[in-house]
């Protein structure tokens, strides 16, 4: 009943995925990015389900995790395309906020090395409580930080997918041999 290498590795990968998703969730909350917040929340739930299935020898839960990783990879590929403006997508749209606010990625103003300052608004613009800012000196632009986050998610998901398939195979083989 010891922990086999595949199960332990999958538990480690799921734990790492959860930590990375929680980090991403925090920064998406700071930027009011509602679509990624919802996606991250679902991802965290399914990763917990995958962890439970791995620890409790429940292959159906691991299958659900495996199916979700395919959707998660597709979502992160979309985010990469969105921030790199591939295929007619534009990072300047309100798509990530479900078109309910003008917020953007938190990294846009707070990236490494970024210095921002308030810029006076043109008198013709009525901004309410919003203001113009100018961001300069960023070591890495915010869209590339978002792409790096998504690439890490894709890498972890692909590794998790492979190990989940292996663990499902091992668990079902053990069930078949015990009957």
Curated annotation (Swiss-Prot):
Q: Which domain of life is it from?
A: Eukaryota
Disulfide linkage: none
Subcellular localization, as worded in the UniProt entry: Cell membrane
Assigned protein family: Belongs to the NKAIN family.
InterPro entries in UniProt = Na/K-Atpase_Interacting
Q: Where are the transmembrane segments?
A: 5-22, 35-55, 62-82, 151-171
Quaternary structure per UniProt? Interacts with atp1b1 C-terminus.
User: What Pfam families does the record tag this protein with?
Assistant: NKAIN
Instruction: Give one GO biological process term.
Output: regulation of sodium ion transport
Whichever gene encodes this chain, its name is: nkain3
The entry's cellular-component GO terms read: plasma membrane
Q: Which UniProt keywords apply?
A: Cell membrane, Membrane, Transmembrane, Transmembrane helix
Q: What protein name is recorded for this chain?
A: Sodium/potassium-transporting ATPase subunit beta-1-interacting protein 3
- What are the leading ranks of the lineage? Eukaryota, Metazoa, Chordata, Craniata, Vertebrata
Q: Tell me how this protein sits in the membrane.
A: Multi-pass membrane protein
């Amino acid at each position: 009943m010891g922990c086999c290498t595949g199960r332990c590795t999958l538990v480690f990968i799921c734990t790492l995925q959860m930590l990375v998703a929680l980090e991403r969730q925090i920064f998406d909350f700071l930027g009011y990015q509602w679509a990624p917040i919802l996606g991250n929340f679902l991802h965290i739930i399914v990763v917990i389900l995958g962890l439970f299935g791995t620890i409790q020898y429940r292959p159906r839960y691991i299958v659900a995790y495996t199916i979700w990783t395919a959707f998660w990879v597709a979502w992160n590929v979309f985010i990469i395309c969105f921030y790199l403006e591939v295929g007619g997508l534009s990072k300047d749209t309100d798509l990530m906020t479900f078109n309910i606010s003008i917020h953007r990625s938190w990294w846009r103003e707070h990236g490494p090395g970024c210095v921002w300052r308030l810029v006076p608004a043109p008198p013709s613009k009525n901004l309410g409580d919003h203001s113009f800012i100018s961001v300069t000196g960023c070591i890495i632009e915010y869209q590339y930080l978002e792409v790096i986050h998504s690439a890490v998610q894709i890498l972890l998901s692909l590794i998790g997918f492979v190990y989940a398939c292996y663990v499902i195979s091992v668990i079902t083989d053990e069930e078949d041999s015990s009957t």
